Amino acid sequence: YGNPGSFHTIGLRPKRAIAKARELVRDLINAKQVKEIIFTGSGTESVNLAIKGITEKYDTGHIITSTIEHEAVTETLYYLEHTKGWDVTRVPVNKYGLVNPKDVEDAIRPDTKLVTIMYANNEIGTIQPIEQIGKICRKKKVLFHTDACQAGGVLDLNVENLKVDMMTLNGSKIYGPK
């Protein structure tokens, strides 16, 4: 293993590999710049970085999510509610596990800083209307994060089409390196 932060040959090889991987992911999701691609150790770490990264900018605020999110999201939001004073609205899903975009829109308040909705649910197979929710968030000027770990390699990941500000992917789902 070479340290990609080093300036010797053993370190330069992984540095180039990481740079190439960033370009590949940028192209896969249609991100504007490679600097928008951040690698973490897991999907959970990525979810935490996205959510906590936004909430660090503010003392408190409001976040919208659904009632069927992955524990990476629910535990992070529970922490923010109970230790940092954030208010979290959990929009319901219908009998098929779908979020109604209108419910998200109706839940947005002046202090809403973030909406975070899972793209695809691996337990029940639901694919959320991410593009519709993304359009609402853009219109209301609210940041939008989607946990797309289960969608990687299967569904459209174009962040411009989906109107997603932050997307969590997991390398194990898209043949990424460990």
What does each of the following model-derived ranges do?
Residues 1-178:
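Pyridoxal 5′-phosphate
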